[in-house]
Amino acid sequence: MGFEIAKTNSILSKLATNEEHGENSPYFDGWKAYDSDPFHPLKNPNGVIQMGLAENQLCLDLIEDWIKRNPKGSICSEGIKSFKAIANFQDYHGLPEFRKAIAKFMEKTRGGRVRFDPERVVMAGGATGANETIIFCLADPGDAFLVPSPYYPAFNRDLRWRTGVQLIPIHCESSNNFKITSKAVKEAYENAQKSNIKVKGLILTNPSNPLGTTLDKDTLKSVLSFTNQHNIHLVCDEIYAATVFDTPQFVSIAEILDEQEMTYCNKDLVHIVYSLSKDMGLPGFRVGIIYSFNDDVVNCARKMSSFGLVSTQTQYFLAAMLSDEKFVDNFLRESAMRLGKRHKHFTNGLEVVGIKCLKNNAGLFCWMDLRPLLRESTFDSEMSLWRVIINDVKLNVSPGSSFECQEPGWFRVCFANMDDGTVDIALARIRRFVGVEKSGDKSSSMEKKQQWKKNNLRLSFSKRMYDESVLSPLSSPIPPSPLVR
């Protein structure tokens, strides 16, 4: 077997065999555990519930209804007359009507407070492709980007794996709700300089994944001023722009650039990554967008986009749907309402058993605080707790360490990729796990919390002796899952 591995490595490239992909991180290992034992209400009611998938399935019925009412929007139905034109080779600039519809949709998701030029819209194969393409445009192997942590685990794949760049965390702390501070940004930059690492830019995810929080104007202005002062790029990943379900509203970096006091900024250093995967719930369509204020970057990204184009059929369909302003307005309004309702239901269910989450107003997930359940404040203890949740409680949640969080005990848990019934089953499992059954318990909420703290504040393994020989996701032979956000 060793000979086979050595032989394989010798005939493949270093890029193909390096470990920068991040596939073996706990974030993706949770996916493997789910794949090996997926929950189904009838076929496998005791299976693992997928709560590691940041997917928005709450409004797909609205899209289905639109398709039924607009059969000409698809070449598979009444739009068949357009089949030949769509099947032919297309310029990688993209269909003009598609780019126009995307620009208009980006404006609507930002409250109509900013305008986007369709000529600056560049296509890519999902946000994954868009993020990698923008890095290829801006940096060389060995260069680095600063990224506030905790941050999306698959950035290692999207931004590092094939580009050869480094990611340097800007450490944020729970003491101020993980807000980005000027001090932390400066410290990360200066440490890189001392190590002779060339910093080419800073990457913001706004709204944040995994925090589900939005950045205020002051923070955006501060970061923008810093990047301009040091002549480095600012890449804003805004793929969760329309997932805001509570105040404060989302503020795009494009809005900051439009403000009078920021006219001195060099717009050539600012770039936006967008997608329809989260806001519309269409990750399978693989629609990623690069929007740059730099002409050279637009031209370069457009040439590179030939490696990851959006299919013409997809462009045709989306151009029709997103051009329906009445539909878009209703969709965005209904999506925000449903996300808010689901978030409230889920977080209230956690609060009943004393589990708190970081206060958030956006996203498809919560940043869940399980620090009281750790035996000790270490990442080893976090991983032990995570294994119990995966193998015993049968929930795939993502440990904070995979998001480069510096404090053990935080977990990202997704709530928008399932129906109401599955959410309730997940909450019931959590209640059983912490020893507080809602049914038959007539004590007050405060008494429940006190009892929970008394009995379960420090996770005891005496009743659930964890046998390391039990299948661990880390050693699972299950093939890798599709690596999605």
Swiss-Prot record:
Chain sites annotated for binding substrate: 55, 92
Q: EC top class, in one word?
A: lyase
Coiled coil ranges: none
Q: Which residues carry this modification: N6-(pyridoxal phosphate)lysine?
A: 278
Q: Which UniProt keywords apply?
A: Ethylene biosynthesis, Fruit ripening, Lyase, Phosphoprotein, Pyridoxal phosphate, S-adenosyl-L-methionine
Task: Look up the domain of life of the source.
Answer: Eukaryota
Example GO BP: ethylene biosynthetic process
> Which cysteines link up through disulfide bonds?
none
The post-translation modification note in this UniProt entry reads: Phosphorylated on Ser 460; phosphorylation may regulate its turnover. May be processed at its C-terminus.
Which reactions are catalysed by this chain?
S-adenosyl-L-methionine = 1-aminocyclopropane-1-carboxylate + S-methyl-5'-thioadenosine + H(+)
The record's misc note reads:
The stability of ACS proteins, and the regulation of such stability, play a central role in ethylene biosynthesis.
Stated role = 1-aminocyclopropane-1-carboxylate synthase (ACS) enzymes catalyze the conversion of S-adenosyl-L-methionine (SAM) into 1-aminocyclopropane-1-carboxylate (ACC), a direct precursor of ethylene.
Under which name does UniProt file this protein?
1-aminocyclopropane-1-carboxylate synthase 2
